[in-house]
C-alpha cells in the first residue's frame, strides 16, 4: 500500500473511495482497518453511489448506500467531464482492444477519475489495473490497495 507523504496530505486531503473498495470491504471487511485510519476527508462520487445502488442485492447493502448518500458530500461529474470521458474511453478501447462490455464498465471508472482530478482528490481503489490504464492518459492522484 502506497501512502502519500504528510506534506502531500496537507495540500490534498480529499479522497474518493472507488466502488471496488466498498464492495470488497462489505464482503470480507478486508479494508476495515485502512478505512477507519484514513487521513482524508472522504467525498462520495455520484458514480460510485450509482454503481453500489445498481448492485445492491441485500437490505444491508441498500441501507449502506442510503447512509452514504445522507452522510457524505456527493460529487458528480460535470458536463465537460462527461464529454472528455467518452474521448478517453475511445482511446482506451483503441489502445487496449476492450470489447463493448469492458468499454461500458471502464467508462464509470473514467468518470470517477476525472472527478477526482478536478477536486485534487486521491482516488482509492483495489482495481489497480483499470485505474492505472486511465492514469496513463489522464493525470490524477491514485492509491491502490
Name every feature range the model reports, one short phrase each.
Residues 1-10, 113, 117-145:
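Acidic, PIN/NYN-like endoribonuclease modules and their adjacent C-terminal/linker elements
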Residues 1-48, 53-67, 72:
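Short, well-structured N-terminal submotif of metal-dependent ribonuclease cores
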Residues 21-22, 48, 81, 112, ...:
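Alpha-helix capping/helix-boundary segments
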Residues 49, 62, 82-89, 109:
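A general structural signal for well-ordered alpha-helical segments in protein cores
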Residues 59-63, 92-93, 140-144:
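Short, hinge-like loop/turn segments at secondary-structure boundaries
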Residues 73-101:
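Acidic catalytic patch
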Amino acid at each position: 500500500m502506497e501512502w502519500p507523504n504528510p506534506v502531500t496530505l496537507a495540500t490534498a486531503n480529499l479522497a474518493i473511495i472507488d466502488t471496488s473498495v466498498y464492495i470488497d470491504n462489505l464482503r470480507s471487511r478486508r479494508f476495515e482497518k485502512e478505512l477507519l485510519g484514513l487521513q482524508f476527508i472522504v467525498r462520495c462520487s455520484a458514480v460510485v453511489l450509482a454503481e453500489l445502488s445498481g448492485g445492491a442485492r441485500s437490505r444491508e447493502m441498500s441501507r449502506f448506500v442510503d447512509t452514504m448518500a445522507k452522510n457524505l458530500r456527493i460529487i458528480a461529474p460535470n458536463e465537460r467531464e462527461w464529454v472528455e470521458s467518452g474521448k478517453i474511453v475511445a482511446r482506451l478501447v483503441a489502445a487496449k482492444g476492450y470489447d463493448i462490455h469492458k468499454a461500458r464498465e471502464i467508462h464509470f471508472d473514467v468518470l470517477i477519475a476525472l472527478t477526482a482530478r478536478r477536486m485534487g482528490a486521491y482516488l482509492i481503489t483495489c482495481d489497480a489495473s483499470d485505474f492505472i490504464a486511465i492514469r496513463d492518459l489522464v493525470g490524477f492522484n491514485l492509491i491502490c490497495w
